[in-house]
């Protein structure tokens, strides 16, 4: 099963909080974000640190400090958020190259296929912006279907 971690889900909430209009300077404290997102302040602080390390958030220390998006929400992709929190997007260990090669790698005829599938998923996630995640009905209208029928695949016509 493909599933994002709860921390990635929380990161999108935090980024959504940062995308909301804010006062002069646009800086938000971790405490404000924690209240807004209903997440614990330590969790928010940890996420802000990871998102800042990935260049998605700018942070400033001190009494007047806080954080803000490093770029507009429409210029931050879902793929970037996932990679900031979870690391490279990879369906199998052989795709991300982080682990030692498996014992079947020499004769594996699937690795090229997994690379193609992985790239397609990465590309799809790269086309979805944070702005789209924050306003899904504008960008992803509800899919209407008859009761008992499976939902159509986005981008495919249903006959």
Language-model region placement:
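Alpha-helical residues within the helix-turn-helix
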Residues: 35, 52-53
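Short, hydrophobic-biased segments on the C-terminal half of alpha helices
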Residues: 48-49
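Beta-hairpin "wing" of winged helix-turn-helix
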Residues: 55-70
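Key DNA-contact positions within bacterial/archaeal DNA-binding proteins
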Residues: 42
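A short alpha-helical element within helix-turn-helix/winged-helix DNA-binding domains
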Residues: 27-37
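Conserved segment of winged-helix/HTH DNA-binding domains
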Residues: 73-97, 110-119
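Short alpha-helical segments that sit at the start of domains
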Residues: 1-15
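C-terminal regulatory/oligomerization modules of transcriptional regulators
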Residues: 96-159
């Amino acid at each position: 099963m493909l599933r994002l971690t709860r921390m990635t889900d929380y990161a999108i909430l935090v980024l959504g909080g940062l995308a909301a209009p804010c006062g002069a300077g646009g800086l938000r404290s971790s405490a404000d974000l924690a209240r807004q997102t209903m997440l614990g302040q330590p969790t928010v602080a940890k996420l802000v640190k990871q998102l800042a390390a990935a260049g998605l958030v700018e942070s400033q220390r001190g009494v007047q400090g806080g954080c803000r998006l490093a770029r507009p929400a429409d210029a931050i992709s879902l793929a970037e958020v996932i990679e900031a929190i979870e690391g490279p997007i990879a369906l199998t260990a052989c795709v991300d190259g982080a682990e030692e090669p498996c014992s079947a790698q020499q004769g594996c005829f699937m690795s090229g296929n997994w690379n193609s599938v992985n790239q397609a998923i990465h590309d799809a996630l790269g086309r979805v912006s944070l702005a789209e995640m924050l306003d899904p009905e504008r960008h992803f209208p509800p899919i209407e279907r008859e009761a008992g029928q499976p939902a159509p695949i986005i981008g495919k016509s249903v006959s």
